[in-house]
Amino acid sequence: MSNNTRAIVAACLTAACLSTMQTANAADTKSPYPAEVVDLAKKASEGPLTDDEANRLISDYPDLAASLPDYRPGKSTEKEYVVPDQTTEDNQAEAHTTEKCSTAHRAEELRSLIVQQVLYEMETSVHFCWNELRVTKVDPPVSEFRNVYEWQNIEGEISNRAWIDDNHEGHAKHMYQVANEIPYVGVVGRSHPYNSFTFKPGGKVLSSGGH
């Protein structure tokens, strides 16, 4: 065999090996989930599954179920509280013009299909002031994410609003965008967690939230 022939054979063998290695590497990163399961994961990221659909993922694909949100009623938790901050009286003696200030807090927690797994918790705080006649001040809300699961990506703030309306009530709302990813596939959906508040004259606070 001539030197040229040996070189050609060696090159062919090298190319074949490279091709085989590339094919093997591609197989390693290929999704192990059937197409219908990926479709079910996308559905879970957009809204509530039926109990049968959720149970299938939990029993057959527990690693996948751990990274998917559970939007079925009663599966997420929330908590709210108001912390007294300070009281300041103005120059008038009337009780209805006494200004008080507090900080309201609300946390919205999203859990996965695996009940014990928290995907994230978003807590929002708003400092506000009022008297008996009107809300006098609402600061922009400030939020913090805790217990963020590895397949949840906090992409950024969508809106941050604080205002007082014509009825002298205060309002605040904070919303974020979170990407929901699953192994081997990537992003299958996005949630938009938010906390919102309404502040009444006299200091009453109403709050709500969602994803």
Language-model segments: residues:
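Mature secreted bioactive peptide module from preproproteins
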Residues: Q92-H211
